[in-house]
Amino acid sequence: MAPQANQDLQHGAFRQYLPDLSTPRFTTIAQNDAYGHARELKDKHAPPWLHGLYVHWRKLFEEPFKGITNDGVVRPGLFKLRDEGVPIERIVAAAQAVVGQLTPAQASKTILHIDSPEWRSWSNPEFLLSDKGIRLDEIAPSLRDGVLAVLRETLSPEGYDKAVGAMRINHFLGELVNARRVMNEHSYNFVLFGAAPSTTRPWGFSFYGHHLCLSVFLYKTQIVVSPWFTGAEPNLIDAGPYKGTHILDVEERLGLRLMQSLSAETQDKARVYRLMKDPAMPKGRWNHDDQRQLCGAYRDNRVVPYEGVTVSSLGAEQQGLVVQIIEQYLLYLPARARALRLEDVKAVFDETYFSWIGGSGDDDAFYFRIQSPVIIVEFDHHSGVFLTNGEPAKFHIHTVLRTPNAGDYGWALRGQIDGALNQDYVWEG
């Protein structure tokens, strides 16, 4: 069977894992909106493992931002101001149109200081853990369309399509489990950072919700889309008006192809754990919600040591596959910015590591990470959260991109912008 045909069968297998909607978990979520659902976690500590993670996240949030590193030391001088050809005038016009529609109450929750720590309070679970900004399923259609126009003008066309695909799949999941008021195509929050959208001063926005979280920093014609999280459960819509929508399959196919192309000896070096939940993993290497991923929500200062094999030690074919994988992870960026970032990544291939967890057969679930001083990308097959598969399956995927060494949220660029860090911001609390 052709690999892609096999992949399509694997992604479509989710229907055998649909949950029993008569159980208390699903009868409760069916009655709740986003705020009631969040109270289940915050007040009733349900589920307890996610509440425990949430408490840990809030402790991490209290730390000053430093950035992800491989050894605890931020490496300076990796990121420079430059012209990336971003259509800043169009992006600003779209954002100004949104600002013009906000009520005073909406504006007070939506327009935050450029240095607000709330940049870092995004998260992937469907629980609304950080209620800031405007929520798309609660606002007027014209304002919602305006927010989507900001995304459309900011992202590449293919990146925008990917984001919309994630949102539509989230809606599909909400229909599958009768949780439409918690998970739908517009169950996402939008927040602006900066005094005002500007063609000459730094600003940005956060767009976040279940399985799609984008952090966007803009300065003149330069853009940073990092960190971001994109996931799907399932990653394929097999019925309804958006039947055939699928995401994250290219990354999956390329990652497996790369691992399978390595010699047995090199595979052994790349594979840091043989099992997806391996007894050899140290405490904290796996948790119920992040599972194998290290660089998700609130992990802004994590130390992630290099593992696996260096990309520079691989052959030309394998290095080409690494480039193709990175291109998929840079898909949200407009074309010129993407090309420049890709050159940044290729320039440090001698410091870039590829690592793997799990099997590498056509039917195996797996995790991989590509990590360097300038980029971290993670791919992870997950067990069910709403679906009932107890083991990781190919139809539930989480992906993350980070820019280490203070590159996230455009932080490494801010000190290079005149006056950007000379603020009189009064920190709350």
Give names to the regions the model predicted:
Residues 2-156, 161-429:
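A cross-kingdom marker for long, charged
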